């Protein structure tokens, strides 16, 4: 999940039982001006329609298939015009006085204000379209055309054709927008990402459309994907050519990092205090790991204990192991009354498609306008068949690790959260998710489920949960320190190896991610804010149950946690 205002990224959205019409309503306030009738509902509806037109890729991901095949204009002039439109919308939002709004509209107003301010921060203050190739990468993923069966494959590939034809123009805009010299870490990320797209278009798309009977469509796809592959390869080569002048200047700097937290998470805490909070949580989890390892692997070093957990593989392989875990996790959530389950839909489990195996596991949740017939799929990547037997075995996670990945992604993590957001009458809450809310909830769910008895009596399961937590703690500290100057990239990499027990390759990847995704502190940041809110709310409501807290927390959509805190206890103060 990227650090932009959160939208349909790595954790996409599920369709509600009754999706809004895919037909475009009579648009009002499409330019960001206050609605003619002065109502908040009309303004919010008009804003959503304006965003769909400005970013048709976002619209397609949300399930608005009248936009299939269209892509946004990323020329500098278009980006500047879009920023001006967002500024105008922000000014219009300021005209809606709290005294004239009901509580639901007031929350939605502040929610939408945050959406706009977050996008403006990344686009105009942090200047990500001009500094960071990663800004573009997640906005180019065509998986919705390939894996979401909202229409027969030929129809979906017609949409993919329009997308592919747009790619050469997009890569030209990306090259024109990026200012040189670029940071080394950004070049590495960009070259890997755009190079991956080049390989995808060249090698992995032809087998997908080979089954088509329509010779004309097949020919057009062949031509378009070849041109897309060339343009991505050329962009990759250009980025590689920038290595000679590359810099180490990836950091936002402490003032901008703090502004990032204020704008994108509504968190205003001195960075020194945040670092102290993060180190305290790291030490808490290391202490818990020592306790678990004293039982699971007595007298062994912590790294050896973690290695023992990783060596115990899921029965039947990763996909079958995950499928079994989902049934058990859902039953555990119900039996323990952890949180309500809004509907009876189930997530499918499948191997990740060959073109999308960069992450070990992810969940694809169709957007809120999508047909309910389009299923949610939890994807797990198998080891590469070209690897050695030892490499394949090492890649398969231990069952203790996989259990909490499944809890994070599905029950009661991202998938269950999506059921709540799509049951919410606010389309704003279904379309935009806050990074710290979404990833914070899913990460919070891992430890909460252990505390409620998941894996009880099995120290191996606790070791699995804690290794996930330690990785997120080191991300938290790396994000702060990489961007404020208290840690080098090499020191971050070392910390991932020594404190999160990552192997050398994963440690390098995790440290690099911190340079181009400074918001990846969101996992631990969100978890800590949710834990604090839970403690404060339960103290004020001593007769309340855990299920009541979770149901109430998830009922607000997925805005920044401080906004939920305001709704639940009356103040944003004391979020951490």
Enumerate the language-model features and the residues they cover.
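Sec-dependent signal peptide recognition
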Residues: 1-2
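C-terminal motif of bacterial Sec signal peptides marking the signal peptidase cleavage site
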Residues: 8-10
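N-terminal maturation segment of proteins
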Residues: 13-576
